UniProtKB/Swiss-Prot annotation:
It comes from the Viruses. The keyword Acyltransferase does not apply. This is Major spike protein G. It holds the Pfam family Phage_G. The keyword Lipoprotein does not apply.
Length: 175
């Protein structure tokens, strides 16, 4: 229910430029950049996506010190491929005791309400995520994953993830 009240995705004013120049999609989905806590915007202008069946992802580490078991994660993304791949984009939740470099075998998938238009994909959505680790000692990560049977292509775009920690209460006028 809370999700319907988030009207826009607030991305960071500054974004990190991806240093990685190429990625090979794999069933273990390589992580594009070391995850940051609670919020991250990643810009890439010429990422070479090598041929392969699988995916790649950009993720954040969730803040588990909040007083709620569930938190909203908002995602905003605009990505374009030179080729027109048929791909699946989603949010994934997973746990790890160390900084992840690939997607582990156990993860939860959350579909997104995005829009495909040729080689372009746009999404602005939010999902309620369980932020408490199911295994003691693990950290919880949420990532934006792109999955396809890729042919070699170039990819460019922006992906922004935010853990919505502050809840804004709107008061209605008295009648």
């Amino acid at each position: 229910m809370f999700q319907t009240f988030i009207s826009r995705h607030n991305s960071n004013f500054f974004s990190d430029k991806l240093v990685l120049t190429s990625v090979t999609p794999a069933s273990s989905a390589p992580v594009l950049q070391t995850p940051k806590a609670t919020s991250s915007t990643l810009y890439f202008d010429s990422l070479t996506v090598n041929a392969g069946n699988g995916g790649f992802l950009h993720c954040i580490q969730m803040d588990t010190s909040v007083n709620a078991a569930n938190q909203v994660v908002s995602v905003g993304a605009d990505i374009a491929f030179d080729a027109d791949p048929k791909f699946f984009a989603c949010l994934v939740r997973f746990e790890s005791s160390s900084v992840p470099t690939t997607l582990p075998t156990a993860y939860d998938v959350y579909p997104l309400n995005g829009r495909h238009d040729g080689g372009y994909y746009t999404v602005k959505d939010c999902v309620t995520i369980d932020v408490l680790p199911r295994t003691p000692g693990n950290n919880v990560y949420v990532g934006f994953m792109v999955w396809s049977n890729f042919t070699a292509t170039k990819c460019r775009g922006l992906v922004s993830l935010n853990q919505v920690i502050k809840e804004i209460i709107c008061l209605q006028p008295l009648k």
